[in-house]
Curated annotation (Swiss-Prot):
Binding note for cofactor: Binds 1 zinc ion per subunit.
Name of the gene encoding the protein in the UniProt record: Nqo2
Cellular component per GO, a single term: nucleoplasm
Keywords, in A-Z order: Cytoplasm, FAD, Flavoprotein, Metal-binding, Oxidoreductase, Phosphoprotein, Zinc
The name this protein goes by in its record: Ribosyldihydronicotinamide dehydrogenase [quinone]
Organism: Mus musculus (Mouse)
Residues recorded with modification Phosphoserine: 197
Binding of FAD, residues: 12, 18-21, 104-107, 148-151, 156, 194, 201
């Protein structure tokens, strides 16, 4: 949709990977719609994933005992976070939609993407207490997880060996994105890359491109325990 801004937070080491292809499809399709698309390619940026004292410029508010959450909150208010954090926060603030593109690692995100979430979505910028979930500071924005798995779709069902995929998405979609106020769209999961044929991969890419054509018309999922755990 013309005028919309999209941030793609991309976490894969190899540009020629299937994740790279999914990212490329998203950039091309959304650009065709007139969207402004920005990509944070975390590996090529050498993005620092560690949450440390070095994220704060100047003296800490408590020089005796360091608390990352407290210190980054204070630093955000004083504009004393490092430039790489502020730059990513600027991208998020400007975006109408944030797409996270990554391979599933141990039922979660790669460490570099976890570090992005830890450092960028700090208190004061993304949330406060009170000021979370539906009152989170990123309310009004959309977020979407686009991920790939080695295992097949059958493995990630309620009766499958890995359990329903909704279970492992709970911490990411509800505990992180919804907590910060995002409206969360249904995930785009490309299953079974370890066993998929070239033709099957082409179908996955085409399906992603087709979905993106109407992405702005989608309704967000219900970020509640019943949706995730089928209560």
């Amino acid at each position: 949709m013309a005028g919309k801004k999209v941030l793609i937070v991309y976490a894969h080491q190899e540009p020629k990977s299937f994740n790279g292809s999914l990212k490329k499809v998203a950039v091309e399709e959304l650009s065709k719609q007139g969207c402004t698309v920005t990509v944070s390619d975390l590996y090529s940026m050498n993005f620092e994933p560690r949450a440390t004292r070095n994220d704060i410029t100047g003296a800490p508010s408590n020089p005796d005992v360091f608390s990352y959450g407290i210190e980054t909150h204070e630093a955000y208010k004083k504009k004393a976070l490092t430039s790489d954090i502020f730059e990513e926060q600027r991208k998020v603030q400007e975006a109408d939609l944030v797409i996270f593109q990554f391979p599933l690692y141990w039922f979660s995100v790669p460490a570099i993407l976890k570090g992005w979430m830890d450092r960028v979505l700090c208190r004061g910028f993304a949330f406060d207490i009170p000021g979370f979930y539906d009152s989170g500071f990123l309310k009004g924005k959309l977020a979407l997880l686009s991920l790939t798995t080695g295992g097949t779709a059958e493995m990630y069902t309620k009766d499958g060996v890995s359990g329903d995929f909704r279970y492992f998405l709970w911490p990411l979609q509800h505990g992180t994105l919804h907590f910060c106020g995002f409206k969360v769209l249904a995930p785009q999961i490309s299953f079974g890359l370890d066993v998929s044929s070239e033709e099957e991969r082409k179908v996955m890419l085409a399906s992603w491109a087709q979905r993106l054509k109407s992405i702005w018309k989608e309704e967000p999922i219900h970020c509640t325990p019943p949706w995730y755990f089928q209560e």
